[in-house]
A protein has these predicted regions:
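Pyridoxal 5′-phosphate
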Residues: 1-375
Length: 375
């Protein structure tokens, strides 16, 4: 199989990730629930992973990072924890349903209102587009760092500079581990990230960074192993947002995934640029194909999507898989607003997304097979 659906999840992980997961399943007890060695080892491992994530994202205090089930969980925690009755939110036209649906749910209940800042035809959201949607009641701005449909990267630093001190939530689902993120440059900004994509951790892992200058309500409450005598949820992080048993094996694997990315960041970036260039140039040569987003590797991550004249993108994806063993994704990619922006609501798109463990030969073969079935 040629696996080119890394934007959904990285299927192939570093061997250290598999080993860490297995070791934790065999040896790790419940962190914070006992003073014996296995529980202490689990607690130390979780803290080590927290520290690795903090270092990768330029975060001074690792305890401001809370572990979640995935980026969707992180985004819901942030959105529903920041927005109050009467609040106004600004999202962009490139957001995933993990943002749109919780915001829409709150609006449907008449709790909040929201506006959508439009992106340009390349899927890029300018800071000015967001500024134009701000109101006195705006309590949160939500921006995807990189599009899961066309790969376009938004300038989160310029957006932060031009939106004053309004709380900002960055969805790093497609950028974490692929684009350098420095939270020291982003005041009053939350960061939601998955563990199973560009960080090469297992599925069922994610995180949310909550800065000290922001107040976020809890989505869930429960046992934390701390302040057990009180019916009140602990107010200190990370315990405030980590109720119940954590995914200890998953977090162990995530720690090794982050270690791998941190130690090989530049090499991974250059490798994925080469693969992305092969996919872009190959698709541009196909008759009847329209590439989405920028037509070079600049200003984008390794998500390469296209539409084809008179061809159904889901059928093309299925044909690539069934006939040639090429795993890609066709359709709307859980991002209807993005497809509306790009003019692909009816057709959807065929998406290729390379990862660190793909080869140039695989990318070239994928383009060759696409040509055979699309032309």
């Amino acid at each position: 199989m040629i696996y080119l659906d890394n934007a959904a999840t990285t299927l192939i992980k570093p061997e250290t990730v598999y080993s860490a997961v297995l070791n934790a399943m065999k040896c790790a007890a419940n962190a914070g629930r006992g003073g014996y060695s296995e529980a202490s080892a689990a607690m130390n491992m979780i803290y080590d992973t927290r520290c690795r994530a903090a270092e990768l994202f330029g975060i001074d205090n690792p305890e401001r990072i809370v572990f979640t089930q995935n980026a969707t969980h992180s985004l819901n925690t942030a959105i529903k924890g920041v927005l109050k009755y009467g609040s106004h939110a600004v999202i962009t036209s490139m957001e995933h349903n993990s943002v749109l649906r919780p915001v829409f749910s709150l609006a449907r209940k008449k709790m909040i209102t929201y506006s959508v800042a439009p992106a340009d035809r390349y899927g890029c959201v300018a800071a000015e587009s967001i500024v134009n949607e701000l109101k006195p009641s705006t309590a949160l701005i939500v921006v995807t760092h990189a599009s899961n449909v066309c790969g376009t990267v938004n300038d989160i630093y310029d957006i932060r500079r031009k939106t004053d001190d309004i709380p900002l939530l960055i969805d790093a689902s497609q950028s974490a581990g692929l684009v350098k993120i420095d939270m020291k440059r982003l005041k009053k900004t939350l960061l939601a990230f998955p563990g199973h994509k560009g960080l090469y951790g297992p599925q069922g892992t994610g995180g949310l960074y909550i800065p000290e200058d922001m107040e976020v309500s809890t989505l869930t409450e429960g046992g934390t192993g701390s302040v057990s005598e009180s019916p009140m949820q602990p107010q200190f992080l990370p315990d405030r947002f980590e109720s119940g048993t954590l995914n200890t094996p998953g977090i162990a694997g995530l720690g090794m995934g982050i270690k791998y990315v941190s130690e090989n960041f530049d090499e991974i970036s250059e490798h994925e640029k080469k693969l992305t260039a092969i996919l872009i140039e190959g698709i541009k040569k196909l008759s009847g194909a329209r590439l989405l987003g920028y037509d070079s590797t600049e200003g984008r991550v390794g998500v390469v999507s296209a539409v084809f004249f008179d061809r159904d993108c889901v059928e093309l994806a299925n044909a690539l898989g069934e006939s040639f063993g090429v795993a890609v994704r066709g359709g709307l990619h859980c991002s209807p607003l993005a497809h509306k922006t790009l003019g692909t609501t009816l057709s959807g798109a065929l998406r290729f997304s390379a990862g660190a463990f793909n080869t140039e030969d695989e990318a070239e073969k994928a383009v060759y097979y696409l040509k055979k079935i699309a032309e």
